[in-house]
A protein has these predicted regions:
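Extracellular glycan-recognition regions
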Residues: 1-183
Length: 183
């Protein structure tokens, strides 16, 4: 496992990664805001081909755009991040796909959401994002394209673009390569 933009304070024990998210961190490219940010934190491993990332995320997000979840990243211009993002005073399910420029989709979550389970799966050029809250069955949040031939840094992501930072924990982080499907 390796860090992209290692935070000042973090610890991993047993099956929990605890991060104090540094302020002024984010991943974004141009769309709607005009700026480029590539300073968020990612803890994961580089994999090629088909893969799965699964994790439960608990956070105390409270400032606009506080975020934590999963990232698949080929480079600074090609990536996907998904998870909880605090937006307009509420936790939201957020997915950003960046292929040169960022595209952002958000949807509502219960106002008291402090934990979410995520599963992100890449098969060929398709990435499927699923989420669940509590004991609910996983729901499909997004199906997006990422170039199939790219190696990806796959793992836990967090950022605090506007606030003072926050604390987040990642539980049962699982990152696995999958053999290609036989046709």
């Amino acid at each position: 496992m390796e860090w992209l933009n290692e935070p000042a304070s973090w610890q991993r024990t047993d099956d929990v990664l605890q991060v104090n998210v540094d302020p002024n961190t984010d991943f974004w490219r141009v769309t709607g805001y005009g700026y480029i940010r590539d300073s968020g934190h990612v803890y994961g491993e580089v994999l090629a081909g088909d893969l799965d990332v699964a994790v439960r995320v608990r956070g105390n997000w409270s400032s606009q755009y506080d975020q934590a979840g999963v990232m698949l990243r080929a480079d600074e211009r090609t990536w996907l991040k998904t998870g909880v993002e605090y937006f307009e005073g509420k936790p939201r399910l957020s997915t950003v796909l960046t292929l040169g420029l960022s595209s952002w989709a958000v949807s509502s979550l219960p106002d008291d959401t402090d934990e979410i389970a995520l599963r992100v799966s890449r098969r060929g050029d398709a990435v499927e994002v699923r989420y669940s809250i509590g004991d609910a069955s996983p729901d499909l949040a997004a199906l997006v394209y990422l170039p199939p031939d790219s190696e990806l840094l796959a793992g836990a992501m967090c950022a605090a673009p506007e606030g003072p930072g926050f604390s987040v924990s990642f539980h049962e982080l699982r990152i696995a390569s999958r053999p290609p499907a036989k046709g």
